């Protein structure tokens, strides 16, 4: 099958949606399918995958408590049109087609076997509310809609009064399960955090507030932090006497991330909101590391209300400290969560998730139908393809 995938976000900026699309592409390539991915890119030379086509440089906009780098407008529409016209796709899979992006452009320009995946969880998305009347006739063109979680599904219902099939984000369970720990990182009583800690919603400040109390109860405890951001600035809130126990590793690749998860005693996800899934939690479970996470809806649902990890009261650093101390002291409890998490991680393996998505493709495609372009006479096509005539 010839499959076209569209990323709304810049390919050269790390993010959960981009990682999902990349891994899905590799999974289908391994199955013998032909894949092409269209994505914005700030630096085209940084793209290493030969199946990725750059649609141009994105612009940064505030979105869902973070900064999204997206591409939109008539020039971008022209590039989408050229890519679709030359792709001869059996199915076109659009990610986040409800925000101004390449995916929305493609949904307006193309017709046929179109599938949309909705990742975001934001009940008060101002942008989507503002353009909802224009979105509805476009989103209706999707033959199938996927939401990565019940939280994302509910967001779709609120904004666009439509429903979706829930298929979670995928991971390679074997990749994380078989990773080797890093001797420089592995030590008892080690807490790990991975994320863009420059974004307040990732909750690093909550973890750092909790760390002082944890250190009093467990003098040997230490904290490893990985991800983009300024470690010096983050450390300003930490007691100087404790700073030697905290190490900032900077941005790390997937191999180092898997090794880090194998090297720590507990993974903590103190995110305060804006999450629809929690891919890092599935990766941690696949690594066999017990989890302490905030009780935001996405994490509570993923961990089944504490069945697969300890939950603490969101933004409550005292409760976070109590839960981490409890898990670090109670080896039996930690082992229980390690085993149950490993079992639960199988639900998110690409061997299952990829096959579920393929079934959606087959249902959307019907009898050997192809993705085609709409006529220029259609209103949405005229709106988004004016750049071709300039």
Regions found by a protein language model. Give the residues of each.
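Carbohydrate-associated surface elements
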Residues: 151, 170
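Short alpha-helical donor nucleotide-sugar binding micro-motif in glycosyltransferases
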Residues: 251-252, 259-264, 279
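Conserved donor-binding/catalytic core segment of Leloir-type glycosyltransferases
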Residues: 183-202, 208-212, 224
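Conserved acidic donor-binding segment of nucleotide-sugar-dependent glycosyltransferases
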Residues: 305-306, 310-317, 326-332, 346
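Membrane-proximal helix-turn-helix segments that form the acceptor-binding/catalytic region
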Residues: 122, 127-145, 157-159
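Nucleotide-activated donor-binding/catalytic signature segment of Leloir-type glycosyltransferases, i.e.
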Residues: 235-256
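Short hydrophobic beta-strand element within catalytic cores of glycosyltransferases
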Residues: 266, 290-293
């Amino acid at each position: 099958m010839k499959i076209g995938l569209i990323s709304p976000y810049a390919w050269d900026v790390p993010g959960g949606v981009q990682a999902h699309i990349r891994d899905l592409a590799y999974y289908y390539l391994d199955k013998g399918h032909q894949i092409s991915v269209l994505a914005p890119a700030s630096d085209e030379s940084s793209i290493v995958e030969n199946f990725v086509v750059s649609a141009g440089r994105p612009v940064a906009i505030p979105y869902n408590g973070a900064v999204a780098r997206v591409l939109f407008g008539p020039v971008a529409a022209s590039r989408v049109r050229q890519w679709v016209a030359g792709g001869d796709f059996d199915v076109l899979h659009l990610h986040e087609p409800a925000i101004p992006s390449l995916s929305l452009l493609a949904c307006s320009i193309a017709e046929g076997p179109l599938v949309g995946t909705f990742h975001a969880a934001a009940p008060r998305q101002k942008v989507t509310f503002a353009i909802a009347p224009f979105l509805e006739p476009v989103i209706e063109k999707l033959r199938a809609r996927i939401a990565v979680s019940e939280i994302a599904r509910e967001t779709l219902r609120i904004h666009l009064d439509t429903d979706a099939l829930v298929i979670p984000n995928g991971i390679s369970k074997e990749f994380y399960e078989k990773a080797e720990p890093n001797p420089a990182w592995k030590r008892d009583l080690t807490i790990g955090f991975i994320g863009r800690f420059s974004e307040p919603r990732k909750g690093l400040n909550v973890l750092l507030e909790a760390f002082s109390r944890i250190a009093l109860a467990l003098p040997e405890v230490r904290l490893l932090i990985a991800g983009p951001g300024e470690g010096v600035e983050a450390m300003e809130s930490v007691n100087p006497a404790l700073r030697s126990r905290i190490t900032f590793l900077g941005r790390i690749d997937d191999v180092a991330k898997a090794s880090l998860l194998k090297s720590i005693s507990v993974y903590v996800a103190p995110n305060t909101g804006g999450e629809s899934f929690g891919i890092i939690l599935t990766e941690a479970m696949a690594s066999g590391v017990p989890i302490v996470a905030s009780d935001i809806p996405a994490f509570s649902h993923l961990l089944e209300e504490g069945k697969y990890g300890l939950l603490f009261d969101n933004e409550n650093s005292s409760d976070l400290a109590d839960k981490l101390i409890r898990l670090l002291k109670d080896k039996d409890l930690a082992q229980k969560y390690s085993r149950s998490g490993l079992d639960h991680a199988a639900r998110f393996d690409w061997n299952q998730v990829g096959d579920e998505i393929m079934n959606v493709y087959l249902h959307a495609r019907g009898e050997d139908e192809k993705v085609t372009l709409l006529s220029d006479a259609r209103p949405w096509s005229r709106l988004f393809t004016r750049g071709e005539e300039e």
